[in-house]
Amino acid sequence: MRLGRDFYNRDTLTVAKELLGKVLVRKINGVTLKGKIVETEAYIGAIDKASHAYGGKRTNRTETLYADPGTVYVYIIYGMYHCLNLISEEKDVAGGVLIRGIEPLEGIEEMSKLRYKKSYEELSSYEKKNFSNGPSKLCMALGIDKGENGINTISSEEIYVEDDSLIKKDFPIVEAKRIGIDYAEEARDFLWRFYIKDNKFVSKK
């Protein structure tokens, strides 16, 4: 069942935790790709110095952070890598959840072509290990870039998240510091990264 607006229109920390175990769906090139979300990070603009919208900052780049809950926010790091976020909280609040890792479930062959430009059976063990265990890696595997910024997952057929009743949900969740935000002063110590314990597609244990 597809997640609706009410799922995202809640406290960002709750959304970040409850996205774990949900299935990210991407339709591209006539193929459906699916991956179980195994790692997330929460960002809350009003109080979070790691957020692009800290202190209510609004720019052309960050405007999507203030969009309706369930909207896709894609930004670029290092001038070339993309990161996928899902907007939480009410419209104009600027909460978001970064998707940091997914476990491939369906369409793995197409994901492999998008990620490495070769079939999955041709991949080395190193390439398989690094298939989608990081925010930019999963964006490559799913063919996500700035063109997807602003998509509403509530109604879109290109990107959305669903709750698969067959997927086990009673997994232990680890709370940890977020990654790559040493500049964020006290916010760098917030335990706002969440991941499924012992899942091999988590970017960093």
Swiss-Prot record:
One of its GO terms (molecular function) is DNA binding. GO terms for biological process: base-excision repair. The keyword Nucleotide-binding does not apply. InterPro entries: Formyl_transferase-like_C_sf (IPR011034), MPG (IPR003180), MPG_sf (IPR036995). SUPFAM superfamilies: FMT C-terminal domain-like. The keyword Thylakoid does not apply. Pfam families: Pur_DNA_glyco. Its EC number is 3.2.2.-. Keywords: DNA damage, DNA repair, Hydrolase. NCBIfam families: 3mg, PRK00802.1-1. HAMAP family: 3MGH. Belongs to the DNA glycosylase MPG family. This is Putative 3-methyladenine DNA glycosylase. It comes from Clostridium perfringens (strain ATCC 13124 / DSM 756 / JCM 1290 / NCIMB 6125 / NCTC 8237 / Type A). The lineage of its organism: Bacteria, Bacillati, Bacillota, Clostridia, Eubacteriales.
